[in-house]
């Protein structure tokens, strides 16, 4: 298994290939996001039995166990458990950037730019210089180089940080491109951060270990509560002094936790038990993507992991058909996760077929602006 994680006994109820007779969890039919995953029965038991030390005083055993495990998994000196992916990204950004003026380069579809409530401006006072990738999949080293602001011209805000997101819209930023971007950043002594909320998916899809991906970044944020089904939390990794600085900001941002052991224990369980299940999730997504294309539906980006992004689809009809069929969608982005069942996949395929049939004749049906959205 990519990511160098050794799986212990996996719960049958979670394994997609065995779900014909397995327990259905609440989000079995929910394709809105992999954030909808819920703790399993075994994870809840682990949480109940977790340590109850104080995290702020650095006395919680299970929190420390998670941080040591992830630091080793990623090949970094230290790790820090945080409450969310947004907090993890913002702690890393703030810890990298010390004194304005400074600017950040990222993909124009990036979570840090679009989905974090303007936190970069609030907390770091940086401007963002986004790039729209010419290949429509991921930004390249050449595009980043053309966007760099170097030198001492006082008219401009110098580039202080480059941020990549992997996966982005379900597409994998290839390792060779990550390496080229890392080389560019190092050449100009600019730190490189990875929003790795779904780096687990990138590792599985590309058969590249988490450690190898992380080796190219100065800091990485990894989410535990999306596809891995932990209830709460992300974890950031980097050099020891960097994590020490981030710990100050975590406290300042209200992220200091007390009895965090139950959440950390769930996070560690999610890596060891649920990470290996992502391969089957990707198979479902690719199966549906291929079926959609056979119906004449175009994809916004290639389906390489757990997302199918539909382009030429009537979203109003799509969501109406989904509602009538008993599955949950909220837009043209379809997200698969470890608690989606085979039955739900088949229902989804029928929904796509009926949508194509209806939109060919019911051309008067149009979604209102803002009626449907793409979540995260």
Curated annotation (Swiss-Prot):
Disulfide cross-links: none
GO biological process, one term: glycine biosynthetic process
Biased composition (Polar residues): 1-21
Reaction(s) this enzyme catalyzes, per UniProt: L-threonine = acetaldehyde + glycine; L-allo-threonine = acetaldehyde + glycine
Enzyme Commission identifier(s): 4.1.2.48
Modification type N6-(pyridoxal phosphate)lysine: residues: 226
Residue ranges of the region described as Disordered: 1-22
Pathway: Amino-acid degradation; L-threonine degradation via aldolase pathway; acetaldehyde and glycine from L-threonine: step 1/1
EC class name: lyase
This protein's UniProt keywords: Lyase, Pyridoxal phosphate
InterPro entries assigned: ArAA_b-elim_lyase/Thr_aldolase, Low_specificity_L-TA-like, PyrdxlP-dep_Trfase, PyrdxlP-dep_Trfase_major
Required cofactor(s): pyridoxal 5'-phosphate
Protein origin, superkingdom: Eukaryota
Record flagged with keyword Lyase: yes
One Pfam family cited in the UniProt record for this chain: Beta_elim_lyase
Keyword Mitochondrion among record annotations: no
A cellular component annotation (GO) from this entry: cytosol
GO MF term list: L-allo-threonine aldolase activity
Homology family: Belongs to the threonine aldolase family.
Complex formation: Homotetramer.
Entry protein name: Probable low-specificity L-threonine aldolase
Species this chain originates from: Schizosaccharomyces pombe (strain 972 / ATCC 24843) (Fission yeast)
């Amino acid at each position: 298994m990519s990511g160098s994680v050794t799986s212990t006994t996996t719960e049958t109820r979670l394994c997609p290939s065995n779900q014909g007779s397995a327990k259905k969890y609440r989000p079995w039919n929910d394709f809105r996001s992999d954030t909808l995953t819920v703790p399993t029965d075994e994870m809840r038991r682990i949480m109940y039995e977790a340590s109850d030390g104080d995290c702020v005083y650095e006395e919680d055993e299970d929190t420390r166990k998670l941080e040591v495990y992830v630091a080793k998994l990623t090949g970094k000196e230290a790790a820090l458990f945080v409450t969310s992916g947004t907090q993890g990204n913002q702690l890393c950004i703030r810890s990298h950037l010390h004194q304005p003026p400074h600017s950040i380069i990222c993909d124009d579809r990036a979570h840090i730019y679009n989905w974090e409530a303007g936190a970069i401006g609030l907390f770091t006072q940086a401007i963002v210089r986004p790039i729209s990738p010419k290949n429509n999949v991921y930004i390249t080293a050449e595009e980043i180089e053309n966007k760099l602001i170097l030198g001492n011209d006082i008219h401009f805000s110098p580039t202080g940080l480059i941020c990549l997101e992997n996966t982005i819209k379900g597409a994998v930023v290839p390792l060779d491109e990550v390496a080229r971007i890392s080389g560019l950043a190092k050449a100009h002594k600019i730190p490189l951060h990875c929003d790795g909320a779904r780096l687990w998916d990138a590792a599985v899809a590309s058969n590249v270990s988490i450690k190898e991906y992380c080796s190219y970044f100065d800091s990485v944020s990894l989410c535990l509560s999306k596809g891995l089904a932990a209830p709460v939390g992300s974890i950031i990794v980097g050099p020891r002094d960097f994590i020490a600085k981030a710990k100050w900001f975590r406290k300042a941002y209200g992220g200091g936790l007390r009895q965090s052991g139950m959440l950390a224990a769930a996070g560690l369980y999610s890596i060891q038990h649920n990470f290996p299940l992502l391969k089957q999730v990707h198979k479902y997504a690719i199966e549906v993507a291929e079926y959609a294309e056979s119906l004449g539906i175009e994809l916004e980006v290639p389906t390489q992991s757990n997302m199918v992004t539909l382009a030429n689809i009537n979203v109003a009809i799509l969501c109406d058909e989904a509602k009538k069929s008993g599955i949950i969608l909220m837009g043209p982005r379809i997200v698969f996760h470890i608690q989606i069942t085979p039955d739900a996949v088949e229902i989804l395929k029928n929904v796509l077929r009926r949508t194509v049939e209806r939109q060919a004749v019911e051309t008067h049906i149009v979604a209102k602006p803002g009626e449907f959205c793409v979540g995260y």
